[in-house]
Structure formats: C-alpha cells, structure tokens
Amino acid sequence: MFDGMLHSAPCALTKIRVTKRSMTRFTVQSLLTLLLLSCTTDSYDKGEGKYSLMQADFCELTVDGQKQALTFTTDDGDTYQFTTPFTAKWIETADTTYRSVIYYNKVSTTQAEAVSVGTVVTVNPIEHWRFKEQPQDPIGFESAWMAKSGKYLNVGLLMKTGRISDEELPHNIGLAQDTVYTYPDGRCAASYRFLHSQNGIPQYYTNRRYVSILLPTVKPDTIHLSIQTYDGIVHKTL
C-alpha cells in the first residue's frame, strides 16, 4: 500500500553538458604539463622530490563568501589549503562546497597549488516513482569505484555528442532507486538504475565524463548498479 508520498513534487533529471569545457586552468605552463600527463603513462622520474609530482583527485572544493576556492578535501580524506585562492566562471554560489576534479601540485602536507579544476556532476539516488520520466537511452560505461571516504560512488561514462546548430543541448541523467532490501542480519542492499536521455543530440563523437553518486547518510552495505549501454545492460556490484 502506498503511503501518500506519491503526491509530492516529481523529480526532474539533471542536465550534463559534454561539449563545453568546464575545467579552469591557471597558467600556460600548467596546461602544457597537463597535456604531457595525459599523453604519457609514466611521465615522471620516480627519483624526484616527494612533493614535486602533479596529482589528480576527485574532491570537495570549499568556497568562501567571495566565491574564492580556499581548500579542498580529496576522496582519500586529505585536506589542503590553496597557496593562492582562486575563483572561476562555474563558481556561482558563495559559502558552499563543489564536487570537483582537480589537478594540483602538492607543496606540503597541508598546502597545494592548483593546476586545473573542474566541476563533477553529482546525482542522488531517488525513489524511482518520484521521477517524471525514466529514460534509459544507451550510454558508454567505462568504470565505477567507491570513494575511500565512502561518501561517493564515482562512475566514468563515455557520452556520444555533437551539434546540429550553435545551440548546445545537454544530456539528462538521474539515478533511480528501485529497491532497498534489509537482510535478517541487518545488512542492507540497494539497487540503483542509471537514467539517461540523449535529448536528441547527434552521436558524432565521444566524450569522457565523470558523475559522482552522493550516497545516503546511512549507506547500503551493498550497491547493485545497472546501466543501459550500447552493448546491453551492465550490472556492477559494489
């Protein structure tokens, strides 16, 4: 029997743009370093100093009242203060935290120099019946892994995109929670289903995008994730 909650406002999907650059880079030298990193699997001499290697991490970026990024905390739980605070066009809200991906130089155990920072789209698992629509257009799946903190489940996607005009249309995504089951011993398992609308976007080329799933405060012991891909439904258990 339903409990009456069906009368609450239906949920919409989250928009994600895949052709527009969302990374903020800080210097030409940093950009060249970033390009070198992306083209080389083992770019650096392992004999270099402990803090000389550029690193890349998913993080929570803390922004102050002036929309300046001051600190970030990685998925491994390490917190750093930026040697030089910065802002960016995509930082639109003051006094908040952004889910981000960051390339940085570790200056000390508590400080870091930002090289390139961008936003990561975050979705929450929502009961399936709360969505206005539940599209499952195929999407490329690359990887899924749990953040060490246990707060996020990160998913790597390959999204097909293109343009038929100057207008840039977004893909629409969401995460439907189909079931939550509690075993007699108290363990909990949740089944999540990835929602995706191609939104009529031409499929001319492929872009890699990452999405973070913000897990409930009381986290399931086991997560079953299903994604409709071009090769059929992929099931991942984490």
Regions found by a protein language model. Give the residues of each.
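Structural detector for short beta-strands of small beta-barrel domains
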Residues: 43-67
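Short helix-loop boundary/capping segments
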Residues: 142-195
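Short acidic/polar inter-strand loop motif in beta-rich domains
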Residues: 108-111, 220, 228-236
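Flexible glycine-rich surface loops and low-complexity tracts that mediate binding to linear polymers
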Residues: 91-113
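OB-fold/S1-family single-stranded nucleic acid-binding modules
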Residues: 106-130
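Short, solvent-exposed, Trp/other aromatic-anchored flexible loops in extracytoplasmic proteins
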Residues: 95, 194-222
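C-terminal motif of bacterial Sec signal peptides marking the signal peptidase cleavage site
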Residues: 35-38
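Beta-strand/loop nucleic-acid-binding surfaces
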Residues: 77-92
